[in-house]
C-alpha cells in the first residue's frame, strides 16, 4: 500500500466512521504500521499483517471510539496487545496521557519502542497483570479505562471499576452488539450505569462493532 492509497483509505474510513482527525495523522500511522510489521516479522504481535487490514482492523477500529475518549486527560488501555486502541488514540489526541498494560512482555516492548520511534510523550507501556488491585500491581487509575476484545463483558465490568478515577468512565469495545436491555442488566450487576452505546461497522469489511460507555452509580 503506497502513501497516497493509505491516506485515501484513512480519509474514507474516518468519513465513514464520522470521526475527524488532524492532517498529519496519516504519516504517523504509517510509521506505526512500519514499526508493527517490522517487529511482527520477528515476534508474534498480531495475526493481522496485510496493510489494508492493519489500517481497518487496528487503526480505524481504534479511531472509531474517538467520540468516547475525546476530552479525557488520561486513558488506561488494559490488555493492550500490540497497542490498540491506545497508540492510535494517542496519535489522534496528542495531549492525552496513555498507559498501555499487557501481560506479554514482547508486546509491551513493542509499545515502548513504537512510542520512542514516534517521539510520543505521555505514553507508558506497562508489563503487568490486572487483577483488580491497582496499587499492588503498579497500574495507575485513569479518567477513561478502555479495552478491546480483552475479556467477556461481565468479567470486564467486574474488573474495570477498580482502575477508574472518581467520576471517570469505562469504555468497552465489543464485537457482537448487545441490546440496551442486555447492557443495562450487565451494568446493574456491578452498580454501574450505561452512559451511552452505539453500534457501527468497519468501513471496508462491514464487520459489526459496538462501543459502550459505563460509569459508577
From Swiss-Prot:
Specifically methylates the N7 position of guanine in position 527 of 16S rRNA. Its EC number is 2.1.1.170. Belongs to the methyltransferase superfamily. RNA methyltransferase RsmG family. This is Ribosomal RNA small subunit methyltransferase G. Its main location: cytoplasm. It comes from the Bacteria. It comes from Myxococcus xanthus (strain DK1622). It catalyses: guanosine(527) in 16S rRNA + S-adenosyl-L-methionine = N(7)-methylguanosine(527) in 16S rRNA + S-adenosyl-L-homocysteine. One of its GO terms (molecular function) is rRNA (guanine-N7-)-methyltransferase activity. Keywords: Cytoplasm, Methyltransferase, rRNA processing, S-adenosyl-L-methionine, Transferase. PANTHER family: S-ADENOSYL-L-METHIONINE-DEPENDENT METHYLTRANSFERASES SUPERFAMILY PROTEIN. S-adenosyl-L-methionine binds at residues 79, 84, 130-131, 148. It is found in: Cytoplasm. One of its GO terms (cellular component) is cytosol. It is an enzyme of class 2 (transferase). It holds the Pfam family GidB.
